[in-house]
C-alpha cells in the first residue's frame, strides 16, 4: 500500500478500518460519504483524513489509484463504475484483508443463521486448542487486527453476499453455506445473481479445502459441483454420506460411512430446528479443522444465544418475550415461528427488500394467534394477514405502541416474538439498534 492514493467510499465501520489500514501501510487516504454530521467531521479530523461529505461524484477520483468500496455502497454505484472504466483498482475492506491475511480463513455464509454459526464455529475451533479470531460481518473489523495473526491461526468470518461480491478471490480453507433463500433482491436484482454470490464461498477452493454444505437446501446441495474442495454435508431431512446428520436423538458425524456420536440433540442449548442445523454446520467445520468430537460437543453445550437471535428478554405477566431483531427476511421469521409450540404474538414489519409479502402473510395467519405490525410494510402486511384469515391484527405507530399492543394481546403461557421479517432502516439505524430498543422498551413498559 506504500505510495498508493486511496479513495474510501463510505466511512462506516468497514470504511474506517480500510482507511486506517492503508495509512498504516504507508498509503494516503481520502474519504467521501453521503452523510455529513458534526460527529463524522470531528472523527475524520481526529484521524487526519481529508474528506468530502454530503455526496460525491467523478471529480473525487482525481489523484486516486485505488478505490475502496464499503459494504453499504452498491457494487454498481456510478462512481464505482466510473473508477473501473478509468482502469482504477477497485477493492473493499474485506478484500484487503483476504489479500494480506497470513492465517487460514473459515467463512460462514447463507441467508440466515450466519452470526450464530460463526460465533459457534469460533468456539468449536477454540475448544480444539486453536488460536481463533472472529469477525467479518459481525463485531469489529478484522482488518483492524490483522497484525495480530500468524500462519497457524484461524480466522472465522461471517460473510454476507455484499462482502462476497467485493472479494476478488475469496479462497476459504473451510467454507460453510447454511441456506439460500431470496434476500437482498433490491440490490442484487435477481435470485440467480444472489445464488452466484453465495457460491463464491466454495468456488475458489483447492483440493485440500473443505466445503460444508446443507443437503436439506437444494441450492446449497447443488454447490457440490461448483467446488474443488472436499465436501462435508450436513442435514436433518436428507441422507448424508460424509458429514453430519442425526439419528435416534444424537448428532452423528459420518466419515466414510462410519457414523460416530457427537452429542445428544436434546443438549443443543438453542431453540428451534434451524439452530440444530446451525450446530451441525459448526460441527462440520470443526471436523474439517481436526477438532475432537467431545471437544466440539462441549463447546456446543455451553454456547449461549447470540444477541438479537431468538434472544430471551424475560417473562412478563406470564408471557415469554423474545428479541429476534436479526430476522430481516421472511425465511428467518419462518424459522423463528417454528421454534415454539406455545401461542405466538408476533411483532413484525420494516423496510422491504423486494420480497413478495403474500407467502409471509399466509404463514403468519396460519401460525400465530396475534400480530402487531409496524414500519413501512406494516399497513400492507396487516391487510394481507387479515385477508389470509387472522382477525387479531393491530397496527402500531412506533415501537412503544407495538410493545403495548402485543402485551394486551398476550395471554399467560404465550410467547411474544419480535421477528420483523424486514430490515430496520425505516425506523432504526440497524437491526442491533432495533433489538436493543425493543429490549429496553419491553422492560420499561412491563416493569423490569
Where in the sequence are the language-model features?
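Nucleotide phosphate-binding/pyrophosphate-handling subdomain across enzymes
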Residues: 2-5, 15-25, 263-369, 383-386
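Phosphate-binding loop of NTP-binding sites
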Residues: 23-24, 59-62, 71-215, 219-230, ...
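C-terminal helical cap/extension that packs against the catalytic core
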Residues: 40-49, 358-414, 448
